[in-house]
Structures are given as C-alpha cells and as structure tokens.
C-alpha cells in the first residue's frame, strides 16, 4: 500500500509538471479552476501557468498584510481548521473520535506537555499551497519521516487510524519568540508530488526513501513571521503545535494565511 500510494503520487507529480502546448494547457488550467472553484483574484491569470504544477504552486501577486505585533500568531496557510484544542495526555485528534499520540507525529521520545495547543490546517486542492511562519522562529531541526501517502480529506481521516502518523511528513522543530518549543508538521498526501522547504533545498520528500532523516541547524535558521517556508505541490495538511498561546475558537473555520489566530501569553 505504501509503495502504491507513493508511486501514484510520483506519477501524478510527473504529469502535473508536464508542459503541454499553450492552448491545451490553458484549457486544462481552466477546467481545473472550474472544477475546484479556484479564486484567482490574488494571483496571475490562468494562461500564465505553463503546467498544472505551476498552477498548484502559484504565488501571491502582492504580499498580504498581517499583524506585525510579536505577540500575535497568524495562520500559516489558507486552509480549513478541522481540529484545534490543547493536548489531552499527549493525545490530539486527526478528526473527531480519531486520536493519535502527538509525540509520535513530531518524532519525540517522551509525551508532549499539555501546555501545547494544536491545530490541523487542511489545504484543499483549491487553496494557495504555500506555508509560512506563524510567528518569529528559530528552526533547530527538520525531521523527515518516510511513510504512506494516503488522502487527508475527511472521509479518509474517519477511515484510517493514525493517518497523520503513518503518512510521510516533515516536522520542523523550532523555538518561538519566548523560547518555547514549537512544532510545524507538513503531512504528505496522495497526489502531493513533493513538499518543498525554501530554507533547505536538501530536504527530499516522496523520493522512495524508507527511513527517518534529521537535518540539524547550528546556528538555528532564523525566520520572521510571514516568511515563506515552502509549499505543497497539491493540497495536504499542516499540524501546528504551539505553547502558551490563547487561540481563537476556529474549529471548522476557513482561514487565510496572515489572519490572526492567537496571542502569546507571557511565560
């Protein structure tokens, strides 16, 4: 199953990256935009994308404004927040009634503290696929975990136990502005060709790997709130674990990158 789902994603990624003649590509792009009801008002017109992958990974034409206050946490992506809560004895929900152990997802040996708040951001095929820093960060490590590439939509989340933990993923281990540990997890999914990270081009995903790989940064990589961390090559999921933060009640709400989603408490 792992080999099949990963192979399908590699094939899809290759096809999505193929550049058809311009008049054919424009028609393909138009069909995709129509099927998924994509709003291109913040992006280049569809005829500017020479492949489906270029459309998937489209960049914003203009920077989005966001609150620059250091105590404000912003949404890292355009997404539906499917679950959000404080950890309960190291347990988080991939969806209602489907728990998993947070430390297994992020790659820690010991359970995570109940001071961690988590939020699942589901990026659908229509969404902007880049992900950004939710606050000022120092990235200490990037942990790559090989795994399946099962769909991460709601039917699949209800069907498959430990889906996030079993799927291919990359965990960014970081410190926030208060020195607290923060985990930013990019979860792979079916038809996601690759996950890319702008601060380290050596991180390879969906590359037939069958092992865990850790990329350590000494000194840490400093990124500012709103910086573009990377992108999926189709929709997937970001899971954010963050401490000492008062989050808004955003379960089942759509958010846009740059929206305020919480406020840091003083330690």
From Swiss-Prot:
The record marks 235-236 as: Cleavage (non-hydrolytic). It is a peripheral membrane protein. Binds 1 pyruvoyl group covalently per subunit. The modification Pyruvic acid (Ser) is found at residue 236. Is synthesized initially as an inactive proenzyme. Formation of the active enzyme involves a self-maturation process in which the active site pyruvoyl group is generated from an internal serine residue via an autocatalytic post-translational modification. Two non-identical subunits are generated from the proenzyme in this reaction, and the pyruvate is formed at the N-terminus of the alpha chain, which is derived from the carboxyl end of the proenzyme. GO terms for molecular function: phosphatidylserine decarboxylase activity. It comes from the Bacteria. Its cofactor is pyruvate. GO terms for cellular component: plasma membrane. One of its GO terms (biological process) is phosphatidylethanolamine biosynthetic process. The active site is at residues 78, 132, 236. Coiled coil: none annotated. Pathway: Phospholipid metabolism; phosphatidylethanolamine biosynthesis; phosphatidylethanolamine from CDP-diacylglycerol: step 2/2. The keyword Lyase applies. It is found in: Cell membrane. Its main location: membrane. Catalyzes the formation of phosphatidylethanolamine (PtdEtn) from phosphatidylserine (PtdSer). This is Phosphatidylserine decarboxylase proenzyme. It comes from Helicobacter pylori (strain ATCC 700392 / 26695). The gene is psd.
